[in-house]
């Protein structure tokens, strides 16, 4: 069900910086009624929305991209993609608890993403992450323990149930890997171009 998975402990220094950033930095809230904005509060704000750094470019943790860059390099190598592609990746952090909302079903595919991933930093006892099929059935995959890193196709619909356990903050780092170039085994080179914003075109070249 997963493309790749591994249990990986986030270094203590990164974890502490991440927690401090969530507590202290201006954060973005996102309501399901479509409204959104910046607030000086965090996931515990009066909107009771889960914390997300997805829309907040100012949310930066020193060393976070380097840490996940090495994890992604290992994953891409084991998938046979490290030597055959050029890629970039993005990260965001989310945090949920019993007093906040959670994440409705959605997907991550816009045309160039090849892999989505989720790293559960602090887990709940009950599994929250699920995939959703065409009949809107929820499928709860694999292990979802603290430290579990797992990847899946970005077109797959997924979500997270509301946290029901008291005094628990479910913390994750999620992201997407997007291809810019791909080399097949028959001397073809595929290049993903963006002629205009959010418009992706794949071109194929014979080498």
Each language-model region and where it sits:
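Short, cationic low-complexity segments
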Residues: 30, 193-207
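Intrinsically disordered, low-complexity regions enriched in polar/acidic and amide residues
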Residues: 46-48, 93, 143, 205
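Generic detection of short hydrophobic beta-strand segments and adjacent strand-loop junctions
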Residues: 6-8, 140-144, 205
């Amino acid at each position: 069900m997963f493309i790749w998975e591994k249990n990986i402990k986030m270094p203590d220094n990164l974890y502490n910086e991440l927690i401090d950033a969530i507590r202290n930095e201006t954060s973005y809230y996102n309501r399901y009624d479509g409204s959104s904005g910046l607030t000086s509060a965090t996931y515990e704000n009066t909107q009771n929305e889960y914390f997300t750094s997805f829309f907040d470019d100012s949310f930066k943790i020193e060393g976070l991209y380097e840490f996940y860059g090495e994890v992604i390099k290992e994953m891409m190598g084991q998938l046979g993609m490290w030597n055959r592609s050029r890629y970039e990746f993005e990260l965001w952090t989310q945090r949920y608890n019993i007093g906040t909302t959670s994440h409705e079903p959605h997907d991550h595919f816009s045309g160039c993403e090849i892999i989505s991933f989720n790293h559960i930093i602090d887990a709940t006892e009950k599994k929250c992450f699920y995939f959703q099929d065409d009949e809107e059935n929820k499928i709860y995959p694999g292990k979802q323990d603290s430290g579990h890193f797992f990847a899946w196709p970005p077109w797959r619909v997924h979500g997270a149930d509301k946290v029901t356990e008291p005094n628990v903050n479910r913390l994750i780092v999620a992201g997407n890997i997007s291809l810019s170039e791909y080399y097949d085994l028959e001397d073809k080179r595929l290049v993903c171009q963006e002629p205009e914003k959010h418009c992706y075109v794949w071109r194929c070249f014979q080498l």
